Amino acid sequence: MSIRSQQRSLHIVFVLYRYFPFGGLQRDMLRIARACVERGVSIKIFCAEWEGELPAGIAVERLPVSGFTNHARNRSFAEAVKKYLQREAVDLVVGFNKMPSLDVYYAADTCFKAKLMQERLPQLRFLPRYRQYLRDEKAVFGRDSHTKILAIAQRSVDEYEKYYVGAAQRCTVL
């Protein structure tokens, strides 16, 4: 028996709110998941919704969520992920949407706080929807976060750093 066969497989959880086959972020997530599986990594994908074919060799689990609004369902999903992580051991949690409990975040989105402050009325940040999105973003980019960030462009890193000082130190541009 070789040393390699005695080693436990790395267990990574990928999380995203919604999978649909024509989304760019979703295609990136699935491509990364397949590349991990090819290297012997155990991948489990958590989502609230999955449209399309399930990927061969990759476990997909739809977590039940509640809420009448998108931001309420997103919060419910993040809470369900957190509960799962409290009872199951995983090596790494990779998020494709901003939420708490991530070890790594694949930053395909722009900075929500920048968009809110520059393009919309800053007063909107007091509405429940915007407060939730800002809390989720802060959970990833805030000063107290330890989440590692994989950015697809340096421009995104610069924008996040403007609103979340210190976040750039945890960013790697792909």
Give residue ranges: language-model regions.
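Hydrophobic residues at beta-strand termini and immediately following loops
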Residues: 63, 106, 174
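An amphipathic, basic-hydrophobic alpha-helix
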Residues: 67-93, 130-139
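An aromatic- and histidine-rich active-site surface loop
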Residues: 90-116, 129, 133, 138, ...
